[in-house]
Amino acid sequence: MKNAKQIKFIYMFFIILFFSSSFAFGAARSTLISLKNSTDNVLILDSSSLKHGIWSTRPPKEILAGRLVTFMSESNKFLTGVEGTTTYKAPDVSRITIHWDNPYIGSNSYDINTNNPDSYLTGYSGGKGNNAEIKVTFFKKNITRDYKVIVMSDPQPWRLETGDPNSSANKKPWENRNRNVVQSMNELHSQRLVDFGIINGDMTEFGRQSTRDSFYKIYNKLLFPFYFGLGNHDYANNVNDCTEIGKFNFSRNACARESVNNMASEISNHYQKELLQNFSSDYNESNLSGSLAYSWDFGSIHYVQLQFHPTYQVELGHYLEPTIHIKPSLEWLKNDLAKAYARGKASILNFHDGTDHFIETSTDEQKKEFKELIEKYNVMAVFIGHTHQVEESNQSGGDPVFGNARIYNSGALFQGDFLLMNVKNKCIDVSVYNGRDGTPKKIQDFQGTCGK
C-alpha cells in the first residue's frame, strides 16, 4: 500500500510538472516591433487590436517625424501565440498597417502595407523565432523636411587608450566606455531626433566574433537605425592570420571571412529588406564576389558606403568553403552615382580609409577616375575614419584625389568621438561631439557644404 501511494504521488508530481512546463512553453511567444517614422509628419495611432495575446508594451499614440518607437505583444494562454494589427495615419490620411501572427504551431507571418504606395514605401526585416523582433520602416518617397544624421567610425572593440585591444581584459572597460557613448547619442536623439547613423569601419579589432558580439551588444541600444561598413581591422589586417578555434574554423582567413559574411548578411537581410529608398548593392552572395558597397537615397541626398576603400581587393580562401572575391567598387560606383545624378541627387561618399591605404595602394589611373566621378556626379562630401583624429579638410577644394568634395573625419567611437550632420535640402552643417562620459558635449562646428 505504501509503495502504491508513493507511485501515485510520483505520478501526480510528473503530471503537474508536465502541464506546468507545457503552459510555460505555450506562453513563450512574443513579437517586438520597432517602427521608424521616416516621413515629413507626425504619425497618429489610428487603431490597434490583438486577436491573441496581451500587450506588454502598447503602441504609442503618436510618432514624431524621425522617431523610432517600439511596442510588444506576448501570449497569455496555454498553447497559443500572438496575433495583432496596428495602424498609424499621416496628416494626408496615408496609413501604414502592420499585421503580425506568431502562432504556437506554424510559421510566423507578417503583412505590412500602405494605402498610398505612390507616395510612401514600407519594408521590414527580422521576424523569425518564438520571440520575434521585426524592424519596420515607413518612408515618404520625397522627404522635404530637414533631418539629422550621426556619422561615426572606429568602435574597434576592445581597443582603448591603454591595455591590449585583443585581450578580454579590455572587454568590460570598452563596453562601459561605449555604453556611455551610446547614451550620449541617445540623449542627443531625444533632443534633436536623429534619423539614422553611419559607421565607417573598424567594427572590430581583428575580425573576431567575440568583439563583434560586444559591438552589437552595446550599439544595438541606439534609438535610431544605423548602417555600417568595414575597415582594415575587419578584413585586411587579418588576411591569412586569424582563426576562430572556438567555432572550429581553422582557416587562417576565418576572421576576415566572418567579417565579410556578416556584412553581406546585414546588407541582404536588413538594409535591403528595410527598403532603404533606391537601395543598391555590389555583392553576389551566390558566387561570393563584389565590393560590398551599397547606397540609398534620403531626401535630396544619395548616400554611398564604400567599405575599407574604393580600390581594395583581396581573395579570401578556405580549405572547405568557396573563396570570397572582394573587388574594387569603382565600376559599380560609376553606375550608381550616374543614376543618382539622373534623379537630381547630390551624393555623399562614406568609407573607412581615405588617407593611407587608399592613397598609397591605388594606381594613378584609379585615383584619376575617382576624382572624375566626384566632379562629374555632384559628390559634395566624403566621410572617413581610420586615423582616430577628428578633422575637416579640403575646405578650399582642388584636392588631387577628392576634387572639390569636403572631407570629414569622424575620429573614433572608442574615444567618444562622433559627428552630427544637419541636413537641409542639399546642404549640410557638421558639428563635432564627444560622449565618453555619457553626455553629448559639443566640441566645435566644422564648415558646412552644399551640393548642386
Model-identified regions with their sequence ranges:
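Acidic-and-aromatic substrate-binding clefts and catalytic sites of carbohydrate-active enzymes
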Residues: 203-212, 286, 356-364
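Active-site glycine-centered loops adjacent to acidic/histidine catalytic or metal-binding residues
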Residues: 154, 201-202, 231-232, 352, ...
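Bacterial N-terminal signal peptides that target proteins for export
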Residues: 2-11
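Intrinsically disordered, low-complexity segments enriched in small/polar residues
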Residues: 23-144
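Short acidic, glycine-rich surface-loop motifs adjacent to enzyme active sites
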Residues: 339-358
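N-terminal active-site segment of His-dependent metallophosphoesterases
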Residues: 142-211
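Extended active-site neighborhood of metal-dependent phosphoesterases/phosphodiesterases
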Residues: 162, 208-332, 369-375, 381, ...
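Bacterial N-terminal signal peptides
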Residues: 11-21
